[in-house]
Amino acid sequence: MKDIVENDEIVLDTSGTECPIPVLKARKLAKELKNGDIIKVITTDPLAKADFEHYCLQSGFDFLESYYEGKKIIIKYKFKN
């Protein structure tokens, strides 16, 4: 499930999928994570920022940032267990 590790971040590319798939993939990935891991989600879903803010709040993770890289949205959060 882990796509790649880049700059000590675990990259999850969900480009081309829409709600709820990006968060569902992140939940599946969470089973493989350890405390303190930084996850970088790459998505094209315009609703993903709000979805991940809610997911992080619900799960006790730290939502770090979101920004655009061209047409893709980058979302970063810190996993806590």
Feature map (PLM): residue ranges:
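C-terminal structural segments of small proteins and small subunits
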Residues: 53-81
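Intrinsic-disorder/low-complexity, polar/charged segments enriched in Ser/Thr/Lys/Arg/Asp/Glu/Gln
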Residues: 9, 36-40, 72-74
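An N-terminal amphipathic alpha-helical segment
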Residues: 1-33
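Amphipathic, hydrophobic secondary-structure cores in small proteins
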Residues: 20, 25-62
